[in-house]
């Protein structure tokens, strides 16, 4: 989905579609010469050997791994002013002891902790967080998820309040 949007709506010259799994990429995209399909590839270990040029943009939607483990690789791949949008999934960031039935994290305090950790990981890996919002679409099991907008390099962070974002997400996306 995000590959198609990046390719079609934003005029990307080349899209690297990275997935640790196999057979996930839409067949229309597989046949597109602008799309490089990198299946059975763990984004945590990506280097310039696999992706030789600096990237201007990255869309990150990972499962079963923390963004804190992905951002170091992204730091090495993005151009100096490159940007990224990361889907922050509390169920994969919070730690098992804070995840409820069916992998759902309902506690707003845990969501706040997750977003604070995301800010720390971003800064530690040379990113400025320009914005954070909640996704209007819940995850498959009903998790509230968040979108973080990053720019590579240190700069002035966006003007946002994590407690207000978490509160709004829980009031707007009630069960």
Task: List the model feature ranges, each with a label.
Residues 1-6:
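Short, small-residue-biased leader/transition segments that mark boundaries at the very start
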Residues 14-65:
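S-adenosyl-L-methionine
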């Amino acid at each position: 989905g995000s590959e198609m949007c990046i390719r079609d709506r934003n005029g990307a010259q080349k899209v690297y579609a990275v997935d640790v799994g196999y057979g996930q990429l839409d067949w229309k995209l597989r046949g597109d010469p602008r799309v490089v399909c990198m299946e059975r590839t763990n984004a945590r270990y990506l280097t310039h050997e696999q992706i030789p040029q600096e990237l201007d943009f990255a869309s990150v939607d990972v499962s079963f791994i923390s963004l804190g483990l992905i951002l170091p690789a992204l730091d090495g791949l993005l151009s100096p002013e490159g940007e990224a949008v990361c889907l922050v999934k509390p169920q994969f960031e919070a730690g098992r002891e804070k995840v409820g039935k069916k992998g759902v994290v309902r506690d707003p305090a845990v969501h706040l902790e997750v977003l604070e950790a995301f800010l720390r990981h971003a800064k530690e890996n040379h990113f400025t967080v320009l914005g954070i919002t909640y996704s209007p679409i819940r995850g498959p099991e009903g998790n509230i998820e968040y979108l973080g907008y990053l720019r590579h390099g240190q700069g002035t962070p966006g003007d946002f309040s994590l407690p207000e974002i978490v509160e709004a997400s829980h009031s707007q996306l009630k069960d």
